[in-house]
Amino acid sequence: MKTANSAHEGAALRHSRLEGQTAESLKDYYSGRKLYGDDFNLNEIREWYQLEENACYEVYDQGRKRMPNNDHLHWCCGYRHVLADRPGLGKVLGLGSGNGEEFRPVRKRIEHLYIVESAAGYLKNDATTTYAKAQVDGSLTFPDSFFDTAVNIAVLHHIPNVTHVLSELFRVLKPGGYCLVKEPITTLGAWHQSRKAGLCPCERGFPRSLLDEMAQRAGFEIVRKTYYEFPPLRHVRDGLGIDTYNSIFWTAFDILCCKLTDWNYRYHRVNWFQKLAPSYVFLVLRKPAANKND
């Protein structure tokens, strides 16, 4: 079975399901009608897991490389809507949260943080954080209705069987609990071709309407939806080292650009003009509250 032991090696590897595939044979996935990976069998899921298990950890130099600071984005598009009707986040699940950097804006509002993570290098418990190793099939080893809040910051697109994982997130949330989902809404390039540097072997984004449908099929209500990341501004961030999503101005300007170019959205983008459209979504989901008459 293939493994990804470094960012360089991981970028060169790809899932065996892609061997011999073409744009034509993958057209149902590139068109956004289906989500690639969601129909994989257990052996295919296991291969994907081994390719992705440590890939992000290696891309960020085993956790030593600085990640962009997205605190303002996470607050304005996610946490503030959860905290609008309650004083704290309670018991929180961070799926694929690595070192937990996405919780900086709200750490004092968390009763206890549980992080489910595939990369063993991140698994270091402390007084306020408990780590658990991610299961190959995405199942969560927690009781029903255990968490008040679940946070998934750019992690679901690294997982093949997303339908199952969304159902697990729904299961472990208390009625009335919130689930934050931040994900790319493009293919992230052609999967059957060589991957761009900096991408993990199997990651792919979501067709935005399909992601909505999948969340709703799992049982969630969509409370709020924000499209963001206008690609030219991403190049400003990466090229100049500006934390655009920790800036009130840059975040607002980016969201405005995405609203103005929403008409140009498509999932699979093959030229520069098609890339002038929002490329990420931030969803605030809620598990419906229990019926008082039950």
List the model feature ranges, each with a label:
Residues 93-139:
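Class I SAM-dependent methyltransferase SAM/SAH-binding core
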